[in-house]
Design a protein with these regions (language model features):
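Amphipathic alpha-helical segments of the small helical/lid subdomains adjacent to P-loop NTPase cores
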Residues: 166-170
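Basic, amphipathic alpha-helical bundle interface domains used for macromolecular binding and assembly
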Residues: 171-178
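AAA+ P-loop NTPase catalytic core and its hallmark functional loops
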Residues: 1-165
Length: 178
């Protein structure tokens, strides 16, 4: 959340609910009765990310209050694909004349500038997180409550995804992992 504030690109917050059972909660669904697609804030952010070079942060708050493997399964698989052009989710089975520009044959490409951040708790109201999720995540454990401190006022700075990606590539070249 704060990283989005610092980068001048607000994060999209998705408060995970215990009833989440499938991808519809994140990406929306086509309503056969109304013949309209019910979109979510997460889907809107993914779509809009294709039009900018910002770091687009999506926060899944309390993501293990429902089973991550159920509602985030498709995204876990997509993010493992080495070819970023294959990072697609099927939103509808076919295309229509008035489909949004970035929707091709019912599919939406997930831009690389979308970052998912999840918070998880470890208590009796949550589900354990499977190895499938842990294997695809960068985990930061906070085992105790932090000590309050005053941070210096820091001016926000627009940092593009391209800039961050360039810094990553430079760091990988300068400090190779053996």
């Amino acid at each position: 959340y704060m990283m989005g504030k610092y980068f001048l690109s607000d994060a999209t917050i998705a408060s995970v609910q215990p009833s989440w059972r499938d991808r519809n909660e994140l990406f929306g669904y086509f309503n056969e009765f109304t013949k309209k697609f019910n979109e979510t804030e997460v889907l809107k952010r993914i779509y809009e990310s294709g039009y900018n070079d910002d770091v687009n942060v999506i926060v899944l708050d309390e993501m293990n209050i429902a089973r991550v493997e159920y509602y985030f399964a498709e995204m876990l698989s997509i993010l493992e694909m080495p070819d970023h052009n294959e990072w697609k989710i099927e939103l509808v089975p076919s295309s229509w004349e008035n489909d949004p520009v970035k929707l091709k044959n019912g599919n939406l490409v997930i831009p690389q500038n979308v970052w998912y951040v999840g918070t998880i708790n470890n208590d009796d109201s949550t589900f354990s997180v499977s190895d499938k999720v842990y294997d695809r995540a960068f985990v930061v454990n906070l085992d105790s409550k932090g000590v309050p401190f005053d941070a210096p006022a820091t001016e926000a700075k627009r940092v593009s995804y391209s800039e961050v990606e360039s810094l990553y590539r430079q760091a990988a070249a300068d400090y190779p992992v053996s």
